[in-house]
Amino acid sequence: MRRTNLIASALLACFFSTIPAFSQTVENPAPVGADVTKKMPFAMVGQAIFRSGQSWYEGSGTVVQSKSVLTAAHNVWDPVNGWSTNVQFNRARSGAAIATRTFASRLYVFGSYRTVAARYGPESSRAFASDLGGLRFNVAPAGGAYAGWRADTRTLTAGAPVLCLGYGAEFHSGRELLAVRSASGFIPVVGAFLESTALTFEGGMSGGPVLSEVAPDDFRVVGIVVAGSATPPAGGIRALDAAGAAFLATYLRY
């Protein structure tokens, strides 16, 4: 998914129009509302704002350990500009209200991402299959609380319903948490990159969590949003597999 420039997203939001639900054949992201944003595990999701080169961009992420946030690798590293700078995480943002604002002290990307993205391009399926990134903080963004996660790709391919979250800034303002539900599962494309043509994601949602209810009221992060297309409609995710679990256990364990 292309990075969403903050200036461009503000202009695009002006042209957004809501299509009646009865005419939709594809699920599109919609705001969850301020009250839901404050509840677990939604309150662990945040807006990431960062600088790459001479421009500012927006993405999403989830607190998965006391001082660690899981996001997309393309939010923190780019083949042209290298590492992102001034990475700010606005947890549980709803309009002007932000639960906590923290700045990352360290950035991480999945082992093969830089090589693959440089060779095939960050918009390639191969790059999306390695598109895991992490943020480390000196202070806990949620006071020590965090969302649980699980590495189980069967949750995503068996057709079980999952909820995909992020701060979409393509057709929305980027200041509200959006959600879109997948009821039909995802199809494997390359490695841990899965796709669905039954839903779409907006720019700015990249790095946001894919949540599965593994038990009543027990939601776990099982993947992250990495790619989206309105024409043709499609949404791509990077599933948490064994390699993804090793990445979290190694770099996002604090």
What are these regions, as identified by a protein language model?
Residues 25-43, 50-56, 77, 81-142:
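Conserved catalytic-core segment of clan PA serine endopeptidases
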Residues 53-55, 94-99, 173-174, 214-220, ...:
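Short, solvent-exposed loop/turn segments that connect beta-strands within catalytic domains
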